[in-house]
Amino acid sequence: MLSPRKVKYRKKQRGRLSGEAQKGNKISFGEYGLVSLEADFITARQIEAARVAMTRRVKRGGKVWIRIFPDIPYTKKPAETRMGKGKGGVDHWNAPVKLGTVMFEMSGVPRELAESAMMLASSKLPVKTTFVVRRDLR
């Protein structure tokens, strides 16, 4: 699963996601993309589940790009632990996804197959998504 090798600070405050994506909102590498219609944090496990679903649907054909990376630590205290005694340890890593972020890109497969693979991947994610085609194709 995806996680950063080295971070400046081990723990971080949760924060909120507001507004639309200013960066990462255009298709850069592939022909087709999966764009978020909501803002949320996506875990490394959800990204991996979506990637596996896409690659299995296209039977390892074509190329898939993951455009988001989980670099936000999510901390959690152990079960049945009293409050206090400091912030909990890092439980997993999240990727911040704003409205309009291109999360996955794909190329080298027919449009119908790419769309079905992206829709299968979107069922693994906690945000509403839409399938987009690069403008300079048609």
Swiss-Prot record:
GO terms for cellular component: cytosolic large ribosomal subunit. PROSITE patterns: RIBOSOMAL_L16_1, RIBOSOMAL_L16_2. InterPro entries: Ribosomal_uL16, Ribosomal_uL16_bact-type, Ribosomal_uL16_CS, Ribosomal_uL16_dom, Ribosomal_uL16_sf. Residues 1-15 have a biased composition (Basic residues). One of its GO terms (biological process) is translation. Residues 1-21 are annotated as: Disordered. The keyword Ion transport does not apply. The keyword RNA-binding applies. GO terms for molecular function: rRNA binding; structural constituent of ribosome; tRNA binding. Keywords: Ribonucleoprotein, Ribosomal protein, RNA-binding, rRNA-binding, tRNA-binding. Binds 23S rRNA and is also seen to make contacts with the A and possibly P site tRNAs. Part of the 50S ribosomal subunit. HAMAP family: Ribosomal_uL16. Belongs to the universal ribosomal protein uL16 family. This is Large ribosomal subunit protein uL16.
